């Protein structure tokens, strides 16, 4: 009974049986030094993971002052079991500027918190969500959504999301959002399509969005896919277009990957080369470390795991800022300690 009480991954029926046995033999268990407090038992149901990252970023833009950043970031991921189907998940972040030895916000910040339920092939997430567009490998959006998301399907998988995005794009404005994506895998080929609708007053005041500056919507269509030549080499591509914008309305990415570093596999490594074009009126918040919205050009990178749970990354971008047609480049380096 004591060993069973220490386990935190039992079903509801098994847990009820253990609780009845613990109540019946409480005196014997206490005499053996087994602690039967419900508070202590429930505390074991909260699991913590996280990482500590050091990032170096050197950003260059033609006719602008160079920018060099050194950032130390701690992130914690608590996961609490609610019952057999539901969990509560969250992420906490604290940043420190290595040049000034000061935190950017001065405190630990809650990035998101949500409840996630799983019922076979159905997954439901409610709350504030770390949200990405998946079909395009997060070329259009990698940020947060306050609302709900549902995933379901087997051969063809679907994702539907509805909610509100704060700090939409690179501005401190909000947007209402609805989106759907469909994807499937056929042997070595994976592909999908998506539609994403954004509504915000931000678009009316956005310079270079439309000719008349009257539209407050973005309707983004996308397609993406990947092909695995073997266990080491894969080619990925994606394309997206905003049907409402008149300018800078297209985004595309082609990437060739070789292997990849795994934090659990010491000595593993990987590399990639890519060309990306990220029009600012469609790639609102892209996921990349060395390319941002309104940039285009080549990117290369490599990852390596020198020790278990310690990974390193180096990336370089050379290209242009699209709107002003000026040269741009960025160097990015990272060391991550996962726990």
Predicted regions and their residues:
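N-terminal periplasmic/intermembrane-space "pro-region" immediately following the signal or transit peptide
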Residues: 1-51
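Outer-membrane beta-barrel pore domains
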Residues: 8-9, 16, 20, 36, ...
């Amino acid at each position: 009974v004591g060993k069973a009480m220490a386990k935190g991954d039992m079903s509801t029926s098994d847990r009820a049986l253990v609780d009845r046995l613990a109540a019946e033999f409480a005196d014997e268990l206490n005499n053996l030094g087994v602690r039967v407090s419900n508070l202590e038992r429930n505390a074991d149901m909260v699991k913590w993971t996280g990482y500590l990252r050091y990032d170096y970023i050197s950003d260059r833009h033609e006719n602008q002052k160079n920018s060099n950043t050194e950032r130390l970031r701690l992130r914690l991921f608590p996961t609490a079991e609610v019952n057999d189907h539901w969990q509560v998940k969250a992420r906490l972040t604290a940043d420190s500027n290595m040049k000034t030895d000061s935190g950017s916000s001065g405190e630990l910040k809650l990035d998101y918190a949500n409840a996630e339920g799983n019922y076979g092939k159905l997954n439901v997430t409610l709350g504030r969500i770390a949200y990405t567009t998946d079909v395009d490998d997060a070329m259009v959006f990698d940020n947060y959504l306050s609302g709900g998301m549902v995933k379901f399907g087997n051969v063809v998988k679907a994702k539907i999301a509805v909610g509100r995005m704060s700090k939409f794009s690179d501005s401190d404005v909000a947007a209402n959002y609805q989106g759907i994506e469909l994807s499937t895998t056929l042997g070595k080929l994976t592909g999908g399509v998506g539609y994403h609708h954004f509504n915000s007053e931000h678009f009316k005041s956005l310079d270079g969005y439309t000719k008349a500056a009257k539209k407050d919507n973005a309707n983004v269509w996308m397609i993406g896919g990947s092909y695995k030549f073997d266990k080491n080499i894969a080619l990925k591509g994606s394309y997206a277009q905003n049907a409402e914008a008149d300018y800078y309305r297209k985004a595309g990415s082609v990437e060739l990957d070789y292997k990849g570093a795994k934090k659990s596999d010491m000595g593993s490594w990987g590399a990639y080369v890519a060309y990306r074009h990220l029009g600012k009126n469609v790639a609102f918040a892209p996921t990349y470390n060395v390319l941002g919205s309104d940039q285009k050009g080549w990117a290369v990178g490599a990852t390596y795991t020198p020790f278990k749970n310690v990974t390193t990354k180096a990336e370089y971008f050379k290209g242009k800022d699209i709107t002003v047609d000026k040269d741009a480049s960025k160097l990015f380096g990272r060391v991550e300690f996962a726990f």
